[in-house]
Amino acid sequence: LPNYHTRCKMKKGILAVSFGTSHIDTMEKTIDVLEKEFAKTFEEAVVYRAFTSNMIIKKLKRTANIKVQTVGEALEKMAADGIEEVIVQPTHVINGIENDRMLQEVMEHMHLFRKVYVGKPLLSSVEDYKKAIHAVMEKTVIGEDEMLVLMGHGTDHHANSAYPTLEYTFHSLGYQQVLVGTVESFPDLRNVMAKLEISGRKKVVLM
């Protein structure tokens, strides 16, 4: 998040933007945790939630009667609540389609507020990659005969380059027992399987 501890007396709000999930248990372990951390760190701000996936928003309403707002709806609610200064923080991993969609909605609603700040996705700079990698490896134990495989969704957006870049950075930092794959793009599962075969390792830790 950008520096948000200011002396300004304007009413502040943080909009946490996620792709979303229809699995309540997963939401409690991920999105809920992040939003609570935002609220704890920035006590002077009110935290709001928005999802970018309309499919997930509709499914949550249909199956669990849970109403989650779109980015535009949440911004309109914040304005109605008297919020004047907004920080929009995505929980997205890459600067892909969902992040572009979020930015478009923010642009369309900026006139509702005196100040609007927009944070970046997880992997936005070289240092971001390094910090993310070290954070993962600090919590992960890999045996000599094992390979850690990280799987992402993948996209036809040019931001998909983040996935092979992530694998390259793992290796450049000395973590040779790590591969990165995607479900719907490159590197695909066949690429990952080929590298696993070359490595000779028979056990995989999937993350």
Whereabouts are the PLM-identified features?
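Active-site-proximal alpha-helix that buttresses catalytic centers in soluble enzyme cores
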Residues: Y4-M207
